[in-house]
């Protein structure tokens, strides 16, 4: 394979992995540990 193809595939895999991890952190099991500043604020 050519170098450009390998670089493109590597960057694409990295981007998909990062997006999947971000979605898992935002909506998956770790999201229960996140605090909501709007709920913490009292009027």
UniProtKB/Swiss-Prot annotation:
Keywords, alphabetical: Chloroplast, Membrane, Plastid, Thylakoid, Transmembrane, Transmembrane helix
Entry GO terms, CC: chloroplast thylakoid membrane
Mode of membrane association: Single-pass membrane protein
Membrane-spanning segments: 5-27
GO biological process terms, semicolon-separated: photosynthesis
Keyword check for tRNA-binding: no
Superkingdom field: Eukaryota
Pfam family, one: PsbN
Predominant localisation class: plastid
Ranges in coiled-coil conformation: none
Cellular compartments annotated: Plastid, Chloroplast thylakoid membrane
Lipid biosynthesis in keyword set: no
Its biological purpose: May play a role in photosystem I and II biogenesis.
Family affiliation: Belongs to the PsbN family.
Name under which the protein is recorded: Protein PsbN
The species this protein was found in: Pinus thunbergii
Lineage of the organism: Eukaryota, Viridiplantae, Streptophyta, Embryophyta, Tracheophyta
Encoding gene (name): psbN
